[in-house]
């Protein structure tokens, strides 16, 4: 039997589904689901690379979780010009450069789930983010209801390092921040003078 000479690719929605204020749950898997790459050093390097991709393409990440063999990211576009496919390509290229230095790389394509309108409603959206945050719990890396202690979970909104996903007022502050950024953009004179 002949084997295909090319790798199968995941089907994607139309380009427009990943643009503007789209909300997408991305999963990036290490090739062959190998482990051994995740460390505190890599986590902070990943956050640096993620910051550049998110700022460049106007993306916010209310929850991220690096697991031993894969990464979960919930992204939402901040501006009408936001493009998550370009942001993901940018991030994967930079991350793969770093991963290859230590003998790892991502699988060819990330998995994505573009959230439908009903999945973007506040309670459902927050529940989806909590599901991502509880990955370490389901994997037995932390105890039941100890997912907030997992050291490789966080959030990233460019310009707002003070946001912490497990603080009691997080979602109120996150929503206010995203609304402000959508209205005023990532850089404004007011921000620069504060």
What are the roles of these predicted feature ranges?
Residues 1-194:
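Short catalytic/metal-binding and nucleic-acid-binding patches
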């Amino acid at each position: 039997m002949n084997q295909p000479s090319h790798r199968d690719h995941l089907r994607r929605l139309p380009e427009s589904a990943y643009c503007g204020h789209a909300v997408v749950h991305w999963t990036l898997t290490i090739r062959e689901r190998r482990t051994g790459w995740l460390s505190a050093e890599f986590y902070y390097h990943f956050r640096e690379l993620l910051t550049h991709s998110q700022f460049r393409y106007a993306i916010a990440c209310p929850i991220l979780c690096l697991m031993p063999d894969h990464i979960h990211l919930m992204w939402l576009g901040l501006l009408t010009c936001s493009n998550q496919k370009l942001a993901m390509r940018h991030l994967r290229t930079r991350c793969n450069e770093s991963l290859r230095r230590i003998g790892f790389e991502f699988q060819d394509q990330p998995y994505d789930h573009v959230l439908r309108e009903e999945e973007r409603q506040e309670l459902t959206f927050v529940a989806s983010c909590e599901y991502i945050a509880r990955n370490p719990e389901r994997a037995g890396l932390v105890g039941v209801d100890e997912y907030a202690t997992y050291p490789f979970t966080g959030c990233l909104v460019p310009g707002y390092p003070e946001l912490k996903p497990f603080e009691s007022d997080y979602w109120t502050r996150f929503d206010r921040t995203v609304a402000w950024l959508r209205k005023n953009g990532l850089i404004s004179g007011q921000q620069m003078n504060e």
